[in-house]
Amino acid sequence: MQRRGFLKWLVSCLAVINGLILGIPFIGTLLSSAATRGKAAWSRVGAVDRLPLGVPVEVRFQSSGTEAYFHRSDLNSVWIIMHSRGDATVFSPVCTHLGCHFTWNQQHGRFECPCHASVFALDGTVLYGPAPRRLDTLPAKIEKGVLYVEYERFQVGTPEKKVI
């Protein structure tokens, strides 16, 4: 092998090694982000004995999780309906139409979205308005008298419930 050929080979090998050294951590980060995206952690919402039975209550709580290498902490809210001390329905506070936060109208016994007048029954079904689907429920569990919620975000404006 001549000197010029050897130098071309050496430079090519160094370029490949450099590409691997720089590329593998980058690809690992991308794969790690894709693998952990959308996985919510269980967040403590509060004691169930402080929640009234059969009446929707909006509760704010701190949720946290890790996405890729970043730890995040968010202030979230949910609507909770306690059916018994061991059974609850938890709704995302976001209207399924365009993402506005809805409220509970105690006088009429229904959830109402102030943005485009979507109205939902106590069980989350659409009574009228442009909302394409019922209210989104969140996974919930009760352990030792404490309610935990797996907070998720959903795509709005579509007939199917899709976690984003």
Regions found by a protein language model. Name each.
Residues 109-117, 127-136:
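Short cysteine/histidine-rich metal-coordination sites, predominantly Zn2+-binding motifs
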Residues 100, 117-120:
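Flexible, glycine-rich terminal cap/loop adjacent to redox cofactors
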Residues 59-64, 119-125:
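Short Pro/Gly-enriched beta-strand edge/turn motifs at strand-loop
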Residues 4, 93, 122:
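Short alpha-helical basic/polar micro-motif
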Residues 106-110, 122-125, 129, 143, ...:
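Beta-strand-rich cores of mature extracytoplasmic or soluble domains
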Residues 8, 12, 18, 25-96, ...:
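N-terminal pre-ligand scaffold of iron-sulfur
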Residues 1-7:
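Twin-arginine (Tat) signal peptide motif
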